């Protein structure tokens, strides 16, 4: 179920999510989680942007997509109340959140936490 570098990893089952998250934490890279829903128009709008960011930051971050309807407990664990919500984890701790389909804010927040300057 592992994705190649630069790809968004979709997690649809709780046991797959747990394994993928543990593996990502061991990489010491920034973890970026897109909490989304199939019925959410802003989520669909930002999906290609999120995929592009996964390619742009592939050397310093791992990107996940979690459907809040499929993994409700995971969404609750991270305090997700609106979609899309992007949660950033570094060294096992939540370091930032971006709520809404705000691509510039998402890009800037990822760049800040990876230390990677991109245009």
From Swiss-Prot:
Pfam families: Thioredoxin. Preferentially expressed in floral tissues. One of its GO terms (cellular component) is cytoplasm. InterPro entries: Thioredoxin, Thioredoxin-like_sf, Thioredoxin_CS, Thioredoxin_domain, Thioredoxin_H-type-like. GO terms for molecular function: protein-disulfide reductase activity. It is found in: Cytoplasm. Its main location: cytoplasm. Residues 2-115 form the Thioredoxin domain. Disulfide bonds join 40-43. It comes from the Eukaryota. Keywords: Cytoplasm, Disulfide bond, Electron transport, Redox-active center, Transport. Participates in various redox reactions through the reversible oxidation of the active center dithiol to a disulfide. The H form is known to activate a number of cytosolic enzymes. Belongs to the thioredoxin family. Plant H-type subfamily. This is Thioredoxin H-type 2. The lineage of its organism: Eukaryota, Viridiplantae, Streptophyta, Embryophyta, Tracheophyta. The gene is THL-2.
């Amino acid at each position: 179920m592992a994705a190649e570098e630069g790809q968004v990893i979709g997690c649809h089952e709780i046991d797959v999510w747990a394994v993928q998250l543990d593996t990502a934490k061991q990489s010491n890279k920034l973890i970026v989680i897109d909490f989304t829903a199939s019925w959410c128009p802003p989520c669909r709008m930002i999906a290609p942007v999120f995929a592009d960011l996964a390619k742009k930051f592939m050397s310093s971050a791992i990107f996940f997509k979690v459907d809040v309807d499929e993994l409700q407990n995971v969404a609750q664990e991270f305090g997700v109340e609106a979609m899309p919500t992007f949660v950033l984890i570094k060294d096992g701790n939540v370091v930032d959140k971006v709520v809404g389909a705000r691509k510039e804010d998402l890009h800037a927040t990822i760049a800040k936490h990876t230390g990677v300057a991109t245009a």
